[in-house]
Amino acid sequence: MALPISKVDFLIFMCLIGLGSAQLSSNFYATKCPNALSTIKSAVNSAVAKEARMGASLLRLHFHDCFVQGCDASVLLDDTSNFTGEKTAGPNANSIRGFEVIDTIKSQVESLCPGVVSCADILAVAARDSVVALGGASWNVLLGRRDSTTASLSSANSDLPAPFFNLSGLISAFSNKGFTTKELVTLSGAHTIGQAQCTAFRTRIYNESNIDPTYAKSLQANCPSVGGDTNLSPFDVTTPNKFDNAYYINLRNKKGLLHSDQQLFNGVSTDSQVTAYSNNAATFNTDFGNAMIKMGNLSPLTGTSGQIRTNCRKTN
């Protein structure tokens, strides 16, 4: 008996939307480049050992890549006389970093397996390995992404959430990429590591009331009302170089660094999820890994789409 046409259409639709992620596999390089993952891990561990902040920087690179036209390494492309990349976008300029580490990794895997391992996959694996290097839990990275030949400055300016966003803006930015409000709270936990520049939180520490006064004053010492724009302060004041659930504990104590951080715990719908994670690190770790897998599945180029760049900074 034939299915009603509506059900047939639905089944076809479900097959199509699953096609992209179905082509990604955790063992994609098992035979093509068996030492790729260990090479990436070693390079990340070395970079993070030299500078703990680099772990957060590599994690952020993957996020800023995936939120702009999918996980395709477009964020790594340099501007040229006839090509405009995403590095000069407002959320990226003088902010995202770690490109040299990615260059090093790419050079190493190219020497092992020329033209096999994509820059997009390097970003995904480096993000996971950075979290692990700083004490966080691991997750199963799906692989097989290819690299874009295009970038979108306009999308980088419009799609990435800003530090001054209210909760509604954050929910919208993440919803536009298919994430639930819970997953917004989960992925925001990446701010348990890393640092932000004074310009990102100056307004908060001088003008907002939902901030611990002692915490605000300590930040003001390093972030004057005028000047010191690039001075850095850690997102997590308690364990800045450890990937844990302290970010959520800090939010409950009104010690969120950015306006957008504290928006997650401010007498709003997300308060309960922040509280849950502050009380259960294991749940946070599990949810974070699952959310990262989902993020890594944002519009990947697979099969014959895109290319495998030889140099992550430019197209072949």
Swiss-Prot record:
Signal peptide positions on this chain: 1-22
Record keywords: Calcium, Disulfide bond, Glycoprotein, Heme, Hydrogen peroxide, Iron, Metal-binding, Oxidoreductase, Peroxidase, Pyrrolidone carboxylic acid, Secreted, Signal
UniProt keyword Ribonucleoprotein, yes or no: no
Disulphide bridges, residue numbers: 33-113, 66-71, 119-312, 198-223
First-listed, main subcellular location of the protein, grouped into a coarse class: secreted
EC number: 1.11.1.7
Active site: residue positions: 64
Modified residues (Pyrrolidone carboxylic acid): 23
Annotated site residue numbers, Transition state stabilizer: 60
PROSITE patterns: PEROXIDASE_1, PEROXIDASE_2, PEROXIDASE_4
Cofactor(s) for this UniProt protein: Ca(2+); heme b
Reaction catalyzed: 2 a phenolic donor + H2O2 = 2 a phenolic radical donor + 2 H2O
Residues binding heme b, per UniProt: 191
PANTHER family: PEROXIDASE (PTHR31388:SF247), PEROXIDASE 72-RELATED (PTHR31388)
Descriptive protein name: Cationic peroxidase 1
